[in-house]
A protein has these predicted regions:
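Alpha-helical, hydrophobic structural elements that either
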Residues: 5-242
């Protein structure tokens, strides 16, 4: 099976920033950095940029694509709810697709940001593709559930979005490796952007490996966050610096 491992290097000092939501949350989110090249989402499809259900209004504001992930900022508003107790992250259950057909697979995605007033939360969401994104396109998102108070409260509804994105290739590159590390693990390629490092691997069936990444000085990139998806074998690691 194939595997994807993504690491976020905190390179904020070296990165290219737009105002509004990205500027307000970029230093505190998991995939930190400066999003100057983020694009205000055009109003051509205004009806697909805002959705309301169960008393919660969600509005997409900006989008940025580094070549592997699409980062979208959202504003969550609800007059009858208090977001001040939610900390810096709200989890939502989503289905999303980079093609015309919506995926039927549910994914828990974090809205990473902050509460700006009692009834308004702003944050950034990160959507990953299975491989490197080579062309501009449209990300389709369906939010099914909003989880509050550490998933103690679930609000089910339907919030649908169509987000056009542009691939920014500056500072991003894919490096072919094609190296077998041992009898059951090979590294196919590595994708590097200002926001993350993605390692594409191939593992033989039934065997799972632990992977460590090192910078150019031989220093190990530390891990803060690990997420695993066993079939399709996706692993994500959060790094503190390279």
């Amino acid at each position: 099976c194939g595997s994807v491992l993504a690491v976020n290097p905190s390179l904020a000092a070296n990165l290219p920033i737009l105002g509004t939501i990205f500027q307000k949350v970029e230093k505190g989110v998991i995939y930190s950095g400066e999003y100057k090249d983020a694009k205000k989402i055009t109003q051509e499809k205004e009806n697909h940029l805002s959705a309301q259900s169960q008393g919660i209004k969600l509005t997409a504001s900006e989008v940025y694509c580094d070549g592997f992930s699409v980062y979208v900022t959202m504003k969550m508003q609800a007059e009858q709810m208090d977001f001040s107790k939610e900390g810096n992250r709200i989890c939502v259950k989503t289905q999303y697709s980079f093609g015309k057909q919506m995926s039927k697979e549910d994914s828990d995605i974090l809205m990473d940001g902050k509460c700006v007033d009692k009834h308004t939360f702003i944050g950034m969401m990160k959507f990953d593709k299975e491989d490197v994104i080579k062309k501009d396109g449209t990300l389709r998102i369906r939010i099914l559930t909003v989880y509050l108070q550490d998933k103690e409260q679930s609000i089910c509804g339907s919030w649908n979005f169509e987000i056009p994105y542009t691939v920014y290739k500056k500072g991003s590159r894919e490096i072919a490796v094609n190296k077998k590390l041992n009898s059951h693990l090979a590294v196919k390629s590595v994708f590097v952007s200002p926001y993350q490092i993605v390692v594409f691997t191939k593992e033989s069936g039934g065997v799972h490996s632990q992977i460590a990444l090192f910078d150019q000085n031989g220093e190990k990139i530390s891990k803060k966050l690990v997420r695993k998806k066993v079939h399709g074998s996706r692993k994500f690691m959060q790094g503190e610096g390279v």
